[in-house]
Amino acid sequence: MSVQNICSTKAYDMLISNDNAFLVDVRTREEWQQVGIPHLDNKNKVIFLSWQLNKDFEDNFLSIVNDKIHAIIFFLCRSGYRSFIAANFITNIGYKNCYNISDGFEGNNQDKGWKQNNLPWQF
């Protein structure tokens, strides 16, 4: 199965309605601190694991979600590019229910993104 693109509003709906779904935010620590982070009531549903310049991404990912091979996993970055690469990478190691949030946290040329769609977020 290949990575599917999904908009932030649909991803949010699936995240809050499915106990087997979680979000991996692959932005940098600076982005999390300066721009904000997604907020979900269930804190265990959001994983912060930077993709950029992280040679240990796979090991770190597996140490956090090793028992969730059948989970629905949403990947998020600023605009949908890094998250797509990370989602493909994780799909290639055996996780089959991976989605890329194509409009990202801040949006892109076509779409608003998590923050501009007024989905829950915080600093």
UniProtKB/Swiss-Prot annotation:
Disulfide topology: none
SMART domains for this protein: RHOD
Name of the protein in its database record: Uncharacterized protein RC0915
Alphabetical list of InterPro entries matching this protein: Rhodanese-like_dom, Rhodanese-like_dom_sf, STR4-like
Positions of the Rhodanese domain: 17-117
Pfam families hit by this protein: Rhodanese
